Amino acid sequence: MTDIKSMTERQLADFFKNMGQPAFRAKQVFTWLHRGVRSFDEMTDLSKPLRAQLAETCFITAPTVARKQTSKLDGTVKYLWELADGNCIETVLMQYHHGNTVCISSQVGCRMGCAFCASTIAGKVRDLRPSELLDQVLFTQLDSGMPVSNIVLMGIGEPLDNMDNVLRFLELVNSPHGMNIGMRHISLSTCGVVPGIDALADRQLQLTLSVSLHAPDSETRSRIMPVNRAYDVETLFAACHRYFQKTGRRISFEYAMIDGVNDHDWQAELIAKKLKGMPGHVNLIPLNDVVESPYKPSRRIGAFQQKLESLGVTATVRRSLGGDIDASCGQLRRKEMQERGQL
C-alpha cells in the first residue's frame, strides 16, 4: 500500500500518469489530502471507480486524539496523537501575539539520550513519515479551529536523524496548494548532528536553525548529551560557522539552564568566545523537572543572561507556556506509556 499523503505534487503527477489519469488529478487529490480528509470517498470530484481503485492501492494517514490537555493559564494545547500502528506522538499548540505556533515531533521516541529530557527515556521506536509530520500540523489546526502560522520541529525526536522524511515534509507544508506555510515561519531544532547541519546549509533553506547547545565545553556536554561524543563542541561550532557563511542566517542556540552544571560565568564567557564572528541568539530555557532525572532548574538564569549580554551576546529567557499541563517534551507520552505498562 502506498502512503499517498507523503507524495509531493510532482510525485502524484507521475503516479496518476502511470494510472492513465489526466495530470490535473494530482492537484485535485493533493488539495483534498491537505484539507484533512480521512478517506477517498470524501473526494467527491473523483469518480467512484477511481476512488475505489485508490482505496485498493493507497492509504491515507489520519491520527486520533489519545489525550488532550488545555492550559487554563495561557490556552496552550497539548495533543497526544495515536498513530495507525498504536504508537503515540506529541504536538503542542501555542498562542502568541504574532500567530499560532505548532511544535511537532519528528520521531516516535528519540535515541539521542539527553540526560535531562523525557523524550528519550524509552529510546527511539521509529521515524515518522512525511505524512505523519504533516498530520500534526493539519489535524491540530482542524481540531482547534485555530489557523497555524508557524511550525517548530522541537518535539519528540531528532529531525536530522530523520532527514529525508523531514525534507519531504517541508516541501509538502510549504506547497501553495497545501498549507502554504513559508520557510521563514519554520524552525528546526537539532541536538548537533553535524552532517545534517551541513546538508541543510547546502540546500539554502530559509528556515531558522536552532541548535540545542546546553553546554559550551565538551566535558559537560558529553555528560548530559551523548551526541557530543560523536560531534564534539568544536566540530559543532565549526559546522555552525559554515552554516552561517553559506546561508547568511542567524542560528538560535537553545540552552536549558541546569543548576550547578552549565550555569557558571566561565561557561557564558566560553559561549561568547565560540560565537565570535557569527551572529547568534542564545535562548535560555528554564529546565522542566523530569522525575527520572537528577538535574534541577538553575537559580542563576537572570545572572547568566546578564553575563552573556555584557559580553555582547543576544540572550533571552524562553517564556514558559502550559505550566499547568504536561506541556514539556515527552511528558504526556511517558504518562500514557506508563498507564499502558510500556515503561
Predicted feature locations:
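Auxiliary Fe-S-binding modules of radical SAM enzymes
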Residues: 1-89, 241-250, 255-343
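Short linear Ser/Thr-Pro motifs
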Residues: 71, 105-106, 119, 189, ...
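P-loop NTP-binding catalytic core
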Residues: 85-99
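Canonical Radical SAM [4Fe-4S] cluster-binding loop centered on the CxxxCxxC motif
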Residues: 95-132
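Conserved alpha-helical substructure of the radical SAM core
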Residues: 121-150
